[in-house]
Swiss-Prot record:
Keywords: ATP-binding, DNA-binding, Metal-binding, Nucleotide-binding, Repressor, Transcription, Transcription regulation, Zinc, Zinc-finger. Negatively regulates transcription of bacterial ribonucleotide reductase nrd genes and operons by binding to NrdR-boxes. Binds 1 zinc ion. PANTHER family: TRANSCRIPTIONAL REPRESSOR NRDR. Pfam families: ATP-cone, Zn_ribbon_NrdR. Residues 49-139 form the ATP-cone domain. This is Transcriptional repressor NrdR. A zinc finger (unnamed) spans 3-34. The gene is nrdR. The keyword Oxidoreductase does not apply. One of its GO terms (biological process) is negative regulation of DNA-templated transcription. HAMAP family: NrdR. One of its GO terms (molecular function) is DNA binding.
Length: 160
């Protein structure tokens, strides 16, 4: 693997170990030329996924792009990064298990919303404001009401 610091073509693996409950291999690498150390992750990719955007354009699924969009929603929130990584991995597994070669971007947005709802209400609202294209304050009010109703429904089930 190429060194990200000096671009030398050959680096050495110093340590390999399973991560994310065995779904990923984490490798620590070192460059023999500049001594730079870095980590890589190896994941199974079941199939190449294509994402159909709202405008009809297709593009390859990009896990990093998904991670960046979730990172924006959780920015400055006290959320364990491992929890976010697990959520992203779960979303990717769900997408791969659909068995469809093309997936609508709306489906991904829905899966992210469901994942964030279980992690952090503020991150959920932030993501929803972009995903649902909020135009005014009443859109925020509606999603907060939706969240509050969901919490009240959950609490009433525990009271029974």
């Amino acid at each position: 693997m190429r060194c990200p610091y000096c671009q030398y073509e050959d680096t050495q693996v110093k340590d390999s170990r399973p991560a994310e409950e065995g779904a990923v291999i984490r490798r620590r690498r070192v460059c023999s030329v500049c001594g730079g150390r870095f980590t890589t992750f190896e994941r199974v990719q079941l199939r190449e996924l294509l994402i159909t955007k709202k405008n009809g354009r297709c593009e390859p699924f990009d896990r990093d792009k998904l991670m960046r969009s979730v990172d924006v929603a959780v920015r400055k929130r006290n959320i364990d990064p491992d929890r976010i990584e697990q959520a992203i991995s779960g979303i990717v597994r769900q997408l791969e298990s659909l068995g469809e070669p093309e997936i609508a971007s709306e489906k991904i947005g829905h899966l992210v919303m469901e994942a964030l709802k279980g992690i952090d209400d503020i991150a959920y609202i932030r993501f929803a404001s972009v995903y649902r294209d909020f135009r005014n304050a009443s859109d925020f009010h509606d999603i907060i009401d939706e969240l509050s109703k969901g919490i009240a429904d959950t609490e009433s089930r525990f009271d029974e």
